[in-house]
Curated annotation (Swiss-Prot):
Encoding gene, per UniProt annotation: fluC1
Stored Pfam families: CRCB
Membrane disposition: Multi-pass membrane protein
Source species: Streptomyces coelicolor (strain ATCC BAA-471 / A3(2) / M145)
Summary of activators and inhibitors of this protein: Na(+) is not transported, but it plays an essential structural role and its presence is essential for fluoride channel function.
GO biological process assignments: cellular detoxification of fluoride; fluoride transmembrane transport
Protein name as it appears in the record: Fluoride-specific ion channel FluC 1
Annotated GO CC locations: plasma membrane
């Protein structure tokens, strides 16, 4: 049997998704969309509650990203080490809610704006501090969650 060649790398055409594949993926897509809308609404609420002044340091975006990363640190410990979750919990909350809440695209835009406004030291500090804060938040939150769980079990 020969496979039709295409202009794609390797020249092999991808198989069309089966009907059963769509049926199993539709709930995942739906919960990611629902969670994403929820997370984005929460981020928008944070920007209204804690607005960034024109030309100021983007503390809201910085805080949202750090908090979102801390929450995902706790969430991953709970669903991987404590109690397995329903198959839609991780895509809803981890990918959807937290993906919609955190905003690394706005981080990039904020960084570019700081540089464009001639605020090089602030832009560089923000550019370096955000991923450092995000990674530290994930690590510390996961560590703290494990400590609390160990303490509760003893």
């Amino acid at each position: 049997m020969t496979v039709p060649r295409t202009g794609r790398p390797g020249g092999i055409r991808a198989a069309a998704p089966s009907r059963s594949g769509w049926r199993t993926q539709a709930p995942v897509v739906a919960v990611v969309a629902l969670g994403g809308g929820t997370g984005a609404a929460a981020r928008y609420a944070a920007s209204l509650w804690w607005p960034t002044p024109a030309g100021g340091f983007p503390w809201t975006t910085f805080g949202v990203n750090a908090v979102g990363c801390a929450v995902i640190g706790v969430f991953m410990v709970v669903i991987t080490e404590v109690r397995p979750a329903h198959r839609l919990v991780r895509p809803f909350f981890g990918t959807g809610v937290l993906g919609g809440f955190t905003t690394f695209s706005t981080y990039a835009v904020d960084s570019r704006s700081l540089f464009a406004d001639g605020r090089l030291p602030t832009g560089l500090a923000y550019l370096a501090a955000t991923p450092l804060a995000a990674l530290t938040a994930v690590w510390l939150a996961a560590w703290a969650a494990r400590r609390v769980l160990k303490w509760r079990q003893s």
